[in-house]
């Protein structure tokens, strides 16, 4: 709502957030069985098709244009360097611009085969270094939201739970 979306758009954005990587289901058997091995250039090109595959899946299932375009363009960077269409600035639908910020943040605070998760504070610092990729107005809304006292406490609790689980695993 801080970004000026209607209640209906907020609801649709939550659906797009749940479905934004649905196109990866089409490629899971090929790419995600690799485990710790780095992806080849051809595999990276293939993975970059997931927004287009997600677009096809959601189009066939009659989702709204807002949801479909948010999914299709969620890897577009504000400076035009993203994919699949190299859109820039306001050419990128607002839902996709919001998803881009959230998707990058979620990726940074998650473990990956090639690196450990960053703290949420470090993730924000990394995103600030790459600010050209994001709509500044929306990024400032994002910062306001995640610096809310309740949200900060939830992020800290999630990090602590993760650390506690890791410690339990170490002793087994």
Regions found by a protein language model. Give the residues of each.
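Histidine- and acidic-residue-rich, metal-dependent catalytic cores
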Residues: 1-172
């Amino acid at each position: 709502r801080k970004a000026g979306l209607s209640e209906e758009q907020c609801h649709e954005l939550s659906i797009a957030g749940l479905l934004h990587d649905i196109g990866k289901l089409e490629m899971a058997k090929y790419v995600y069985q690799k485990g710790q091995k780095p992806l080849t250039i051809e595999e990276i090109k293939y993975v970059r098709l997931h927004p287009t595959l997600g677009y096809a899946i959601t189009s066939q299932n009659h989702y709204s244009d807002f949801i479909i375009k948010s999914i299709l363009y969620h890897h577009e960077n504000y400076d035009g360097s993203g994919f699949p269409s190299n859109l820039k600035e306001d050419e990128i639908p607002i839902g996709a611009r919001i998803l881009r910020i959230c998707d990058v943040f979620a990726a940074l605070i998650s473990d990956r085969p090639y690196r450990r998760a960053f703290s949420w504070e470090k993730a924000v610092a990394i995103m600030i270094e790459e600010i050209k990729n994001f709509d500044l107005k929306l990024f400032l809304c994002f910062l306001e939201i995640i610096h809310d006292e309740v949200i900060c406490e939830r992020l800290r609790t999630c990090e602590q739970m993760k650390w506690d689980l890791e410690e339990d695993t170490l002793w087994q």
